[in-house]
A protein has these predicted regions:
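Short His-Asn-centered micro-motif
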Residues: 78-79, 102
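An amphipathic, basic-hydrophobic helix/alpha-beta surface used to engage anionic
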Residues: 1-36, 64, 74-77, 83-85, ...
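Von Willebrand factor
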Residues: 38-73, 85, 104-108
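Von Willebrand factor type A / integrin I
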Residues: 67-73, 85-167
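Mobile active-site "lid"/loop adjacent to the S-adenosyl-L-methionine
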Residues: 27-32, 40-46, 129
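Residues that cap or flank secondary-structure elements
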Residues: 53, 81, 144-145
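Alpha-helix initiation and N-capping motif
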Residues: 36-39, 55, 139, 150
Length: 167
């Protein structure tokens, strides 16, 4: 939905709109263009896409985009950014383009049950595991680790000069 809103906003500003959907490889690429029909196609592709693969390789997607875009562009990256950032590839992209990172978060991932056994599934790999939370200290440790990872991510984006928005 965020991608659709951005596409309509760019179209209203008379900017070209393109799309790259990726997992471990680029699954869908739509060259930038103007026009209502084009934007509607991009929105349809965003909302109707079902990934063929799991995982996500931001480095590979950025390399693909850098080869595709010869002119300076605005690149909006929508991701959860849970995997380590490809710093050198982002630096290259930042030198040539205006890069904005929009981090999509899930409120359910920010909550844990008070105590007990929980089953977790990695959405990208499909791997399933169980964790037993025995006390509040384990829950506090989980949230501390998440907060530290988020702080590190924000520091990396700031160091790269990339605007970062968390939704």
């Amino acid at each position: 939905e965020v991608g659709a809103v951005l596409a309509f906003a760019a179209q209203r500003n008379n900017d070209k709109v393109g799309l790259t959907l990726f997992t471990e490889r680029v699954e869908k690429y739509v060259s930038p263009a103007k026009g209502n029909r084009h934007v509607l196609r991009v929105v349809r592709d965003i909302l109707g896409h079902t990934p063929d693969h799991r995982g996500g390789d931001l480095r590979h997607a950025l390399q693909h985009l850098q080869k595709s875009f010869r002119r300076r562009s605005v690149m909006v990256l929508l991701s959860d950014f849970l995997d380590p950032l490809p710093i050198s590839t982002l630096q290259q992209a930042r030198r040539r383009h205006d890069v904005v990172a929009i981090q999509i978060t899930d409120p359910h991932e920010e909550q844990l049950p008070a105590l007990g056994r929980i089953t977790l599934e990695d959405a990208e790999s499909g791997e399933v595991g169980e964790v037993t939370l025995r006390n509040g200290e384990e829950i506090d440790a989980f949230f501390r680790q998440r907060a530290e990872a988020q702080d590190q991510l924000e520091q990396q984006f700031n160091g790269l000069g990339i605007d970062h928005i968390r939704l």
